[in-house]
Structure formats: C-alpha cells, structure tokens
Amino acid sequence: AETYAIIWNDNSFQIRATPQELYEVINLKYALSYALDNIGQDLTEEMIVHIAVMINRNIAAISGYRTGQVYIRGAEHIPPAPDMVRNEMVRFIDSCCRTEYRDIFDKLADTHLQFECIHPFEDANGRAGRVLLTYELLHNKYFPIVIPKEERANYFAYLASQNRIGLAEFFQALYEREIARAQKFGYQF
C-alpha cells in the first residue's frame, strides 16, 4: 500500500518507511516513467544505464557500469569482472533485440537471468532488472507483471538456480493473474 501511495501520489496512506525505502520507491517511480516514455524504442545501453542511475538517485553514486567486482548474496554464480561488463551488456542487448524465443515468457526468463548474472551496476541490479521486465512486456504489447511479496522467495530461487524454464513458467503464471485481475476491472483482451 505504501509503494502504491508513493507511485500514484495518493496521500490517503500514512507512510512508515526509512528514508532509503522512500528513495527506492520514488526512484522506481521515475525509472518506470522513463521506461514508459521510451516504450516505442528498442532497448539500448543508454536506456539501461539511465534507468540504473535513476533507481540509485540519492542512494548510491552510479554513473555507469560497475568498476569493481561484485558478488551476489545467495548465488553460486560470480558476475563477470568489471572490464567484461560492457561486452556482456552488448550481448545482453543483442539477445533482447534480435534473438528468437519460443514466447515472451521464455524471452523474459532468459534475458532476466542474463542481466542478473552480469550484475552490471554497483547497486540496485534487481530493481533495474525488474524495470526492464516491465519495459520488455509493454514494449511487446503485454500487460506488466508484479512479483508479489509472498512470491519473492520463489522468484529468488529461480534466479539462484538459473532455472530458465521455471522462471518462464513463473512469469507466465504472474501474467495470467494480472490479466484475470484486469478483466475484473473491465479490460478485454
């Protein structure tokens, strides 16, 4: 409810959050707005970096790809060395724009796993990756998905195990829930 209140400028909620949590949600709002403004364009490095910069505003000084080695908590995978990040991101963007996939959910799972494995920024890679999920769905004329709090453990398990098929099925199930929810509000598909 608090995230909703901040994103939609709803002042009817009393917010009990730390300054960092507030910045995270406010920054997410601006990053999503930027992604929506660019929905008609193919994904570029500049867009991805701009999203990461926006997500980290007032939290961490991010101006581009990371310059140090990072490790992902709970994962066995070690992201590439900093000097390899740009090349990996070029490959990632090529996958997003040119690779043929079985369906949108397979594409989302594959590219999301690629992005999270690259871990291109010092901080907020998860939030940036989820903004990119929303961008990719909307860019391909699909409803966006939301990963509910009670489903986060499943989401992180798919990431940690690099389970592309499971993650694709997870995204598809979330999408189907969003469609059902939208239909309750009168949207027709």
Positions of the model-derived regions?
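FIC/Doc superfamily catalytic core
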Residues: 1-123, 127-189
